[in-house]
Curated annotation (Swiss-Prot):
Belongs to the UPF0677 family. This is Putative S-adenosyl-L-methionine-dependent methyltransferase MMAR_1595. S-adenosyl-L-methionine binds at residues 132, 161-162. NCBIfam families: mthyl_TIGR00027 (TIGR00027). Exhibits S-adenosyl-L-methionine-dependent methyltransferase activity. It comes from the Bacteria. Keywords: Methyltransferase, S-adenosyl-L-methionine, Transferase. The keyword Methyltransferase applies. The lineage of its organism: Bacteria, Bacillati, Actinomycetota, Actinomycetes, Mycobacteriales. Its EC number is 2.1.1.-.
Length: 318
């Protein structure tokens, strides 16, 4: 049975708005004349959710309405959509490079409605493990199944709360801690506490052998500044009142943990034998020709993109 926006899937209202928002952004990118990424499944999630807000974002109608009333605010929205597209492309390229280098197990922590296991061209014998809240995975897999989608890699879903003992669930699902792994941490860290972030990377490190790769969207010091958060919240409020199609837009910053003392991800990894490099979101968007207008430079999210590889001389007990 095909799912349409006129028949929302049972339980769709429980799927995190953040996951649906990112799917809508990928659907919008897929519609572009020269898309950075093509995700033929993103629109399926938008339709299955049956929420006009995300349908309007995916179709471009929300942006067009905003542009007619406030072009500068529309440019902010377009930068946000461009950031999600660039982020998706970054992780796509990373994970395919890891697979081409011989890594045969991929773990996505907080996978949301990502569809890499379905839409990327994988080498033989790659297994993709996705860890996410049970309701999100149930919605995703049911929507894909009802639309005849099949994974392009060996796929294993691991329904789990990442605040709990997820390593045990991952290993019980077939993960091999003795084999090199490509780890993906995309769009997750703002929702974790300072302690939970350290625990997450501690568990990743314990489960990694030399030759493992990791990519993470990390938070710069600017990301957590009260002025940065206040500016983003103000823009979301303006979008709500400027465009009727965006009236239901949730303020994702209210879900972030803004406590001080968060570890620098790259430094944390380097201290445990990983060779890490960092790319700012501004440079990432420039790489893919999606930079914000000069006069709206602060519209680019102050994220950091960390890539790392675990060296042979690393102590796994560090």
């Amino acid at each position: 049975m095909s799912i349409t926006k006129n028949a929302p899937r049972e339980g769709a209202e429980e799927v995190a708005a953040t996951a649906l928002g990112v799917a809508a952004a990928r659907a919008a990118e897929t519609r572009r004349q020269r898309p950075l990424i093509v995700d033929p499944f993103a629109q399926l999630f938008v339709d299955a959710a049956g929420q006009d807000l995300w349908s309007m974002v995916a179709s471009g109608a929300a942006h067009d309405e905003l542009a007619s009333a406030d072009p500068a605010l529309a440019a902010v929205m377009q930068t946000s959509l461009g950031h999600i597209a660039s982020r998706t492309k970054f992780f796509d390229e990373f994970v395919l490079a890891a697979a081409d280098a011989g890594i045969r197990q991929v773990v996505s922590l907080g996978a949301g409605l990502d569809t890499r296991a379905w839409r990327l061209s994988w080498p033989d014998a790659v297994t993709v493990y996705e860890l996410e809240q049970p309701n999100v995975l149930e919605f995703k897999l049911a929507t894909l199944r009802d639309n005849g989608a099949t994974p392009a890699a060996n796929y294993v879903d691991v329904p789990v709360d990442l605040h709990r003992c997820w390593p045990r669930s991952l290993c019980l699902a077939g993960f091999d801690p003795a084999a090199p792994t490509a780890w993906l941490v995309e769009g997750l860290l703002p929702f974790l506490s300072v302690a939970a972030q350290d625990l997450l990377f501690g568990d990743v490190h314990k489960l990694s052998v030399p030759g493992s790769w990791l990519a993470a969207e990390a938070l710069s010091s600017e990301f957590l500044k009260p002025t940065t958060v206040a500016r983003q919240r103000a823009r979301i409020r303006r979008m709500r009142v400027t465009a009727a199609t965006l009236a239901g837009l949730s303020n994702v910053t209210e879900l972030w943990d803004l406590a001080e003392g968060r570890s620098d991800v790259a430094d944390w990894l380097r201290g445990r034998g990983w060779h890490a490099s960092v790319l700012t979101a501004e440079r990432l968007l420039a790489r893919y020709h999606r930079s914000a207008p000069v006069e709206l430079g602060d519209a680019t999210p102050p994220s950091l993109y960390v890539t790392a590889r675990l060296s042979a001389e690393s102590s796994l007990d560090a």
